[in-house]
Curated annotation (Swiss-Prot):
<keyword id="KW-0548">Nucleotidyltransferase</keyword>
<dbReference type="InterPro" id="IPR018336">
    <property type="entry name" value="RNase_PH_CS"/>
</dbReference>
<dbReference type="InterPro" id="IPR015847">
    <property type="entry name" value="ExoRNase_PH_dom2"/>
</dbReference>
<protein>
    <recommendedName>
        <fullName>Ribonuclease PH</fullName>
        <ecNumber>2.7.7.56</ecNumber>
    </recommendedName>
</protein>
<dbReference type="InterPro" id="IPR027408">
    <property type="entry name" value="PNPase/RNase_PH_dom_sf"/>
</dbReference>
<dbReference type="GO" id="GO:0000175">
    <property type="term" value="F:3'-5'-RNA exonuclease activity"/>
</dbReference>
<dbReference type="InterPro" id="IPR001247">
    <property type="entry name" value="ExoRNase_PH_dom1"/>
</dbReference>
<feature type="binding site">
    <location>
        <begin position="124"/>
        <end position="126"/>
    </location>
    <ligand>
        <name>phosphate</name>
    </ligand>
</feature>
<dbReference type="Pfam" id="PF01138">
    <property type="entry name" value="RNase_PH"/>
</dbReference>
<keyword id="KW-0808">Transferase</keyword>
<dbReference type="GO" id="GO:0000049">
    <property type="term" value="F:tRNA binding"/>
</dbReference>
<dbReference type="GO" id="GO:0006364">
    <property type="term" value="P:rRNA processing"/>
</dbReference>
<dbReference type="GO" id="GO:0016075">
    <property type="term" value="P:rRNA catabolic process"/>
</dbReference>
<comment type="function">
    <text>Phosphorolytic 3'-5' exoribonuclease that plays an important role in tRNA 3'-end maturation. Removes nucleotide residues following the 3'-CCA terminus of tRNAs; can also add nucleotides to the ends of RNA molecules by using nucleoside diphosphates as substrates, but this may not be physiologically important. Probably plays a role in initiation of 16S rRNA degradation (leading to ribosome degradation) during starvation.</text>
</comment>
<keyword id="KW-0698">rRNA processing</keyword>
<comment type="similarity">
    <text>Belongs to the RNase PH family.</text>
</comment>
<keyword id="KW-0819">tRNA processing</keyword>
Length: 238
């Protein structure tokens, strides 16, 4: 039995609370168990310089963690004057994941920036951020459609993410911090609602994993992401 008393194929309790903040065009509090992330989507009527005059938009993301989102206080990155490599890697991953399901031509010459701020961390902050960011993005696009600023919806599909790993030789879904810090293999999987893979990040922590292990982990991730997409759909209809 896992420390959380979950079955190997069981997600933590997942919730998407929409319209969580007042000012953003899209905002969501996403919870994966004790991991909680606020995702806000901001529409900007401009694009980065490399896209000016090209008739297409852009979707990007920023990621950060509050100082006491973890067991002991982390120093704010702003205080050191630069972002860590981990932060840069995660926010690029979130942006890539969102762009995979957006028709940037249909978005027009505007940019949507999704900020993902971790307020409490218990493992899986990047996968929770991606799953919540999609809901915030979808709400922001709904607002553009309602105002008549878009003639076609540029959102092609859902995107969601989950972690999987090998713990004591067993594939498990949605690792919390305790499992993540002691697992043999850690993998983050990003998929679309139609089952396409956007990104797979997998690392062995000392014990190599086999091809059979990888297939089992991907099957488990597919099952979990289908459930998360269903929860995204339910949240969007509420």
């Amino acid at each position: 039995m896992r420390p959380s008393q979950r079955a190997a194929s069981e997600l933590r309790p997942v919730r998407f609370i929409r319209h969580y903040t007042r000012h953003a065009e899209g905002s969501v509090l996403v919870e994966f168990g004790d991991t909680k992330v606020i995702c806000t989507a901001t529409v900007e009527e401009s694009v980065p310089g490399f896209l000016k005059g090209k008739g297409q938009g852009w979707v990007t993301a920023e990621y950060g963690m509050l100082p006491r989102s973890t067991h002991s206080r982390m120093r704010r990155e702003a205080a050191s004057g630069k972002q860590s490599g981990r932060t840069q890697e995660i926010q690029r991953l979130i942006g890539r994941s969102l762009r995979a399901v957006v028709d940037l031509q249909k978005l027009g010459e505007r940019q949507i920036v999704v900020d993902c701020d971790v307020i409490q961390a218990d493992g899986g902050t990047r996968t929770a951020s991606i799953s919540g960011a999609w809901v915030a993005l979808a709400d922001a696009i709904d607002g553009l459609m309602a105002k008549g600023l878009l003639t076609e919806n540029p959102l092609r599909d859902h995107v969601a993410a989950v972690s999987v790993g090998m713990v004591d030789g067993q594939p498990v879904l949605d690792l919390d911090y305790t499992e993540d810090s002691g697992c043999d293999t850690d993998m983050n999987v990003v998929m679309t609602g139609q089952g396409g893979f956007v990104e797979i990040q997998g690392t062995a922590e000392g014990v190599p994993f086999s091809r059979e292990d990888m297939q089992a982990l991907l099957a488990l991730a597919d099952e979990g992401i289908r459930a998360i997409v269903g929860l995204q759909q339910a949240a969007r209809q509420s």
